[in-house]
Amino acid sequence: MSGLTHFDAAGHAHMVDVGGKQETQRVAVARGTIRMLPATFALIRDGKAKKGDVLGVARIAAIQGAKRTADLIPLCHPLALTRVAVDFELDDALPGVHCVAQVETFGRTGVEMEALTAVQVGLLTVYDMCKAVDRGMVITDVSVREKRGGKSGDWTAEDAAG
């Protein structure tokens, strides 16, 4: 892996010039988890949270988060996303909820940051909608799981782990 790309020779932050890169299909998948009390999990699972459909609202928030990534992360390029898909998986064993976001574009730079932002915003929305009953929820294990396209090629977390 090469050096940090967001700094020039003098050490000043700058937005990377992607003008000379080829446009290709870019895909990134990110995942994260929010752990909670069993009673909080039951409220979400049973659709009985006072604020409404927790996972439905969190899905919309995650999609919006992906779309607004360049507004939140200073050196991210604004991208025309072609797809944002967000899924939630209830996990009785934690108890908690896993969020998986897949983001796609046809462009000159990857969408890893958009996928990560989608997951974080989705999980933050779950926290916001349930914090009245459980302030101890923990957002954890947010990571890129897969990346496809671009000059550096395809990558998966499983392959990287060996």
Swiss-Prot record:
Substrate binds at residues 75-77, 113-114. The active site is at 128. InterPro entries: MoaC (IPR023045), MoaC_bact/euk (IPR047594), MoaC_sf (IPR036522), MoCo_biosynth_MoaA/MoaC (IPR050105), Mopterin_CF_biosynth-C_dom (IPR002820). One of its GO terms (biological process) is Mo-molybdopterin cofactor biosynthetic process. Its EC number is 4.6.1.17. GO terms for molecular function: cyclic pyranopterin monophosphate synthase activity. Pathway: Cofactor biosynthesis; molybdopterin biosynthesis. Keywords: Lyase, Molybdenum cofactor biosynthesis. It comes from the Bacteria. It catalyses: (8S)-3',8-cyclo-7,8-dihydroguanosine 5'-triphosphate = cyclic pyranopterin phosphate + diphosphate. It is an enzyme of class 4 (lyase). Belongs to the MoaC family. Catalyzes the conversion of (8S)-3',8-cyclo-7,8-dihydroguanosine 5'-triphosphate to cyclic pyranopterin monophosphate (cPMP). Homohexamer; trimer of dimers. This is Cyclic pyranopterin monophosphate synthase. It comes from Burkholderia vietnamiensis (strain G4 / LMG 22486). The lineage of its organism: Bacteria, Pseudomonadati, Pseudomonadota, Betaproteobacteria, Burkholderiales.
